[in-house]
Design a protein with these regions (language model features):
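Acidic, proline/glycine-enriched N-terminal capping motif
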Residues: 1-70
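Catalytic strand-loop segment that frames the active site of acyl-thioester-processing enzymes
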Residues: 14-21, 199-226
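Glycine-rich, small/acidic residue-mixed loop/short-helix segments
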Residues: 214-217, 221-229, 233-239, 243-332
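Short amphipathic beta-strand starts and helix->beta connectors
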Residues: 8-18, 60-72, 102-105, 147-157, ...
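Acidic, low-complexity central loop/insert segments
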Residues: 20-23, 28-29, 74-206
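Residue-level signal for inorganic ion chemistry
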Residues: 34, 84-86, 121-123, 169, ...
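Short, conserved charged micro-motifs
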Residues: 36-41, 91-95, 126-131, 174-182, ...
């Protein structure tokens, strides 16, 4: 994982917010097939794999029996087969869960990590660039379709409204490369993982290894707001804790935004993570994005620290803000 204390120049930020940027990554990718693939995965994922029907893209997580996130995942449903895109940090844990819970006669897992690539199309003009490229687009948000066939097929997906990207493409590297070139020819700027994480921070989206830790519960990192959990589907591993929090209680900490408003003489201290309210430590900074002396960040903070509160974060004064960010916090 790259350093999640990011610094971008203004042109790069403007491309992310108002243009189109394409970033090619190499996450863990799994394909689950078999007559019981959908049913088995429905019992593992926090999101509802069945309700959206064939051709759906959804976001969710696999949990421990006590409800903590093991890994998050983007899930692509096509017929009775499911493709899952998982952070590299979650690969080993995902394989362990699949090996322990999926009966081979019903659901078979193929690890495509290293062979498959994912291209993320970021920015407000992402959809326009996809349309101009001639690659083809699904029928609507949260839907997928395939380009090509057989071993060279690439899945193209339009993101749900809250996602930190406009579209994504998943497929073998040899098939994905010419499609990425078409996106660039249509106006997308080639980017890297810093752009990918900057878009995630702007959207208030958590990532494994930063906002999501070993004991993180889905509701602590905005899974309700970003469509990562269903309260109407059947049982799944860890559901009891998730449902109890939703219907009867609340979390003690939540993912919130931080805004260093540029009135301090120095940028936030990259060596400090503590968020202080008076003399009390109330949370920690997990990701930061700085542009021309201004900065925003994601922090996991005690729930009683409301948006609008002034805190000391990274050794500098900051304001707690609701997520996602409005979009103008980094403006000059």
């Amino acid at each position: 994982m790259p350093d999640l204390d990011l610094t971008l120049d203004r042109a790069r930020l403007d491309a992310l917010r108002h243009g189109a940027v394409v970033v090619e990554t190499r996450p863990a990718v799994f394909r689950v097939t078999g007559s019981g693939a959908l049913t088995c995965l429905q019992g593992l994922l926090t999101s509802d794999l069945l309700a959206p029907g064939d051709g759906a893209l959804l976001y969710g997580a696999m949990l421990t029996p006590k409800g903590a996130i093991v890994t998050d995942a983007w899930v692509f449903r096509r017929g009775d087969a499911v493709t899952m895109v998982v952070p590299c940090e979650g690969r080993a844990a995902a394989l362990e869960i699949f090996g322990r819970t999926l009966p081979p006669r019903l659901a078979r897992t193929t690890d495509l990590t290293g062979e498959a690539r994912v291209a993320w199309l970021l920015g407000d003009r992402g959809f326009q660039v996809l349309a101009k490229s001639g690659i083809g687009a699904p029928e609507g948000a949260g839907r997928i379709h395939e380009v090509g066939s057989g071993d060279g097929a690439v899945t193209v997906a339009l993101a749900p409204e809250t996602a930190p990207f406009a579209a994504c493409l998943v497929g073998p590297a040899s098939a994905l490369e010419p499609l990425v070139a078409r996106l660039v020819a249509a106006g997308a700027r080639p980017g890297d993982e810093q752009d990918h994480h900057a878009a995630r921070i702007l959207a208030g989206w958590p990532t494994l290894g930063a906002e999501i830790e070993e004991r993180t519960l889905p509701q602590e990192v905005r899974f309700d707001a970003i469509g990562g959990v269903s309260y109407t589907k059947g049982c799944y591993t860890g559901q009891e804790t998730v449902a109890r929090l939703h219907f009867r209680g609340h979390t003690n900490r939540e993912l919130r935004g931080l805004w260093w408003r540029g009135d301090e003489p120095e940028a936030p201290n990259g060596g400090s993570r503590a968020v202080m309210s008076g003399e009390r430590e109330v949370g920690s900074v997990r990701s930061r994005l700085a542009v021309a002396g201004r900065a925003i960040g994601l922090a996991v903070i005690r729930r009683e620290i409301d948006p609008g509160a002034e805190v000391i974060a990274g050794g500098r004064r900051a304001m707690v803000v609701a997520l996602p960010f409005r979009g103008d916090e980094l403006d000059a």
